[in-house]
């Protein structure tokens, strides 16, 4: 009787493990049945009348579907080749599972401006260009568009709050230059409780993001929204 119980227990464990492995394999192989899709592009006859952004955002269902194409590689080359080493597989998985607020928390933990990077980073040479399923001929995961979708949704849902340091310090820090590096530095220093003043020769903060990138690629309101968040957090520009 004892031997039978042991056998029965091991058999059940084997079946459960096998089922779990099968489920995981199906989840990791979705790229074989779901084709790569990019967000829709505004028609040229409409684009010719303005300088607005030319790509739409993913719909919720489409973003989850495209995020589910990530195979969760053992060695995530997308992350390796990202200059910020963003935790890309993690927030893709969370997006696929409709855990979008958590996806935003992971995305923003290594990136001060994910919605901007999602729009202007050369993903074809970095994360997407080194996606393993791209190398196997299935088409890369649309990482940049999903990154943009996550943070734009976070703004719409009110998940992005002004910085409230746990401690306010008496020391002041001056940041020279209001470009993306200066804005990111100011944000991190403000989180530590320092009083921050950013100095720039131009009348608007953003640097290259404002003065060097056209609206059809990055609308100015996206950058202004970020600088306003810093000002609301106590950063002086």
Predicted regions and their residues:
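N-terminal Rossmann-like FAD-binding beta1-loop-alpha1 element of flavoenzymes
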Residues: 172-196
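Residue-level detector of alpha-helix initiation sites
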Residues: 112, 179-180, 204
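Ferredoxin-type iron-sulfur electron-transfer modules and their immediate structural context
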Residues: 19, 23-172
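N-terminal Rossmann-like dinucleotide/flavin-binding domain of flavoprotein oxidoreductases
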Residues: 104-111, 146, 209-237
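Glycine-rich FAD pyrophosphate-binding loop
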Residues: 194-210
């Amino acid at each position: 009787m004892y031997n039978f119980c042991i056998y029965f227990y091991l058999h059940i464990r084997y079946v459960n493990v096998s089922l779990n492995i099968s489920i995981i394999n199906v989840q990791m192989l979705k790229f074989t049945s779901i084709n790569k899709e990019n967000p829709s592009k505004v028609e040229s006859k409409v684009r010719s009348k303005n300088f607005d952004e030319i790509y739409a955002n993913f719909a919720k269902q489409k973003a989850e579907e495209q995020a589910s194409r990530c195979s969760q590689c053992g060695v995530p080359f997308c992350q390796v080749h990202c200059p910020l080493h963003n935790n890309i597989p993690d927030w893709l998985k969370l997006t696929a599972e409709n855990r979008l607020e958590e996806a935003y928390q992971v995305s923003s933990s290594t990136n001060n401006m994910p919605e901007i990077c999602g729009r202007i980073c050369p993903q074809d040479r970095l994360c997407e260009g080194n996606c393993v399923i791209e190398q196997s001929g299935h088409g890369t995961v649309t990482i940049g568009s999903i990154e943009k979708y996550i943070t734009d949704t976070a703004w719409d849902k009110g998940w992005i709050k002004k910085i409230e340091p746990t401690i306010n310090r008496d020391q002041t820090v001056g940041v020279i230059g209001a470009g993306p590096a200066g804005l990111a530095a100011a944000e991190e220093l403000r989180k530590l409780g320092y009083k921050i003043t950013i100095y720039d020769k131009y009348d608007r903060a953003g640097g290259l993001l404002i003065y060097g990138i056209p609206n059809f690629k990055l609308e100015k309101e996206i950058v202004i929204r970020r600088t306003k968040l810093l000002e609301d957090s106590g950063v002086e520009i």
